[in-house]
Amino acid sequence: MENLEQTCASLRAQIAATEAQLAGLKRELEIAEQAAEVKAQSTTRTITAEDGKTNETREWPLLSEEYKRYGRQMIVPQLGLQGQLKLRAARVLIVGAGGLGCPAALYLAGAGVGTLGLVDGDTVENSNLHRQVLHSSKNVGTFKVDSAIEYLRELNPHPTYVPYRAHLTPQEAPGIFKDYDIVLDCTDNPATRYLISDTAVLLGKPLVSASALRTEGQLMVLNYPPRPVGDKSGGPCYRCVFPKPPPANSVVSCADGGILGPVVGTMGVLQALEAIKVITSPAVNPSASPPSLLIFSAYSTPLFRTIRLRARRANCAVCSADASVTLETLKNGSTDYVFFCGVAGLEATLSPEERISPLEFKKRHPKEVPQDGGRINKEPTIIDVREKVQFDICSLENSINIPISTILSSASSPTNVDANAQPSLPFWLPRELASADSTDPIYVVCRHGNDSQIAVRRLKELGLDRGGQRYVGDIQGGLRAWREQIDPDWPEY
């Protein structure tokens, strides 16, 4: 028994040594092939002068202007001339020309990639300009891809820029992806993220994926190395990391949650860096470079953390041997990404009687005393359920701030200690509103008119409508409608 164990150990050691030798030979072959490529590209030609003398002039693999432009990065040992030639031959696709796509495209174009494709169906808005650094005020209203390419051509005219002025669809994605070597996911919604990852896996393209919200960001290099479907040695895909999409109502956009420009810029720059590494580095060894998730938090120490990711899932819907997602299901539309990720809906939709437009609110509750001697309605209470940071930006006169997050974190209905006790109301509810003597109407307002409906339901569950004797409703359309109907100077953010 002991001899068998020794034999097994010896065989394992020999296998390990042989594999190490093989890896070294592969590396030597790669270096030799690179040297041969440089020699093939650095040819000579004979020029005959007027006096009949001949001179040999060397033709260099890069243009003279390119040596000057890229010289500072070419002297970096990890890049070199061969790395620059690989960049020039590379075809990179960026999906999304926003906060992530702009800095990623900026640095990839500056680095000298040969072809840069940009996919985005949106147009430039003023609210984009603080973070989407390729766009300018004069390009508001134009397609983002056109605005971005205009800037990039000024930066570096050598690459070929290809615009795709539309949002990515399952039917069109394979036809676009097939022409590129690597893909960058710079989008901001789960459905598109799954689509990009699936297409990249099915076509064997490495994928650099990033996201950013508020002051935090995440980065992953997926499907790297890009092995065929069913090959467990390939890098994991987006579905391997997130087999189930997040609940639709939990997805927060930059418009709702906010974003700090340098945060999303950092993640976009890191995407460009990872893309350059994939393009210029030798073939990756999965065991030597395990996949990881990089987490960036601008207000934490340290700023960066790394979490190791698992390998490909054995039951993954796209990269396992039993995959249900194929190029055919993409093209025929049977893979429904919107259905898979779900659609965010209101938790509770109010009836028309529970809603009031800003115009009607002003008619019911004017500041001035009616000149016709008409009856003055009861003084309303306005509850603004936006988060405090938004309330501090702008608020309606005499409104009180009770954030929707605070309302939802409390019990939805009052509880009694005993049969004769008063209901136990939440701490955030002002005493004057909870008073049994108060019958003044309550109007709830938010940014767009969605959270206010949920808040009205909660307030009624707490009994603030006095069984229907007191009006509790929301201002329909929120402060966006207030700007449109009442005050055109109301801050729009």
UniProtKB/Swiss-Prot annotation:
Keywords assigned by UniProt, alphabetized: ATP-binding, Cytoplasm, Metal-binding, Molybdenum cofactor biosynthesis, Multifunctional enzyme, Nucleotide-binding, Nucleotidyltransferase, Transferase, tRNA processing, Ubl conjugation pathway, Zinc
* A molecular function GO annotation: molybdopterin-synthase adenylyltransferase activity
**Binding-site positions, Zn(2+):** C237, C240, C316, C319
What GO biological process, any one, is recorded here?
A: Mo-molybdopterin cofactor biosynthetic process
Signal peptide interval: none
What remark does the entry make about the cofactor?
Answer: Binds 1 zinc ion per subunit.
Its recorded reaction(s) are: [molybdopterin-synthase sulfur-carrier protein]-C-terminal Gly-Gly + ATP + H(+) = [molybdopterin-synthase sulfur-carrier protein]-C-terminal Gly-Gly-AMP + diphosphate; [molybdopterin-synthase sulfur-carrier protein]-C-terminal Gly-Gly-AMP + S-sulfanyl-L-cysteinyl-[cysteine desulfurase] + AH2 = [molybdopterin-synthase sulfur-carrier protein]-C-terminal-Gly-aminoethanethioate + L-cysteinyl-[cysteine desulfurase] + A + AMP + 2 H(+)
Q: Which GO terms describe its cellular component?
A: cytosol
EC number(s) given by UniProt: 2.7.7.80, 2.8.1.11
State which pathway it belongs to. tRNA modification; 5-methoxycarbonylmethyl-2-thiouridine-tRNA biosynthesis; Cofactor biosynthesis; molybdopterin biosynthesis
Which Pfam families is this protein grouped with? Rhodanese, ThiF
Q: Which domain of life is it from?
A: Eukaryota
UniProt domain Rhodanese: residue ranges: 376-491
Report the cofactors.
Zn(2+)
Q: What class of enzyme is it?
A: transferase
Looking up InterPro entries in the UniProt record yields: MOCS3/Uba4 (IPR028885), Rhodanese-like_dom (IPR001763), Rhodanese-like_dom_sf (IPR036873), ThiF/MoeB/HesA (IPR045886), ThiF_NAD_FAD-bd (IPR000594), Ubiquitin-activating_enz (IPR035985)
UniProt-listed CDD domains: ThiF_MoeB_HesA_family (cd00757)
Residue positions binding ATP:
G99, D120, S127, N128, L129, H130, R131, K144, D188, N189
Catalytic residues identified in the record: C254 (glycyl thioester intermediate), C446 (cysteine persulfide intermediate)
Protein purpose: Plays a central role in 2-thiolation of mcm(5)S(2)U at tRNA wobble positions of cytosolic tRNA(Lys), tRNA(Glu) and tRNA(Gln). Also essential during biosynthesis of the molybdenum cofactor. Acts by mediating the C-terminal thiocarboxylation of sulfur carriers urm1 and mocs2a. Its N-terminus first activates urm1 and mocs2a as acyl-adenylates (-COAMP), then the persulfide sulfur on the catalytic cysteine is transferred to urm1 and mocs2a to form thiocarboxylation (-COSH) of their C-terminus.
- Family as reported in the entry's similarity comment: In the N-terminal section; belongs to the HesA/MoeB/ThiF family. UBA4 subfamily.
Q: What is this protein called?
A: Adenylyltransferase and sulfurtransferase uba4
List the top taxonomic levels of the source: Eukaryota, Fungi, Dikarya, Ascomycota, Pezizomycotina
Task: Give the gene symbol.
Answer: uba4
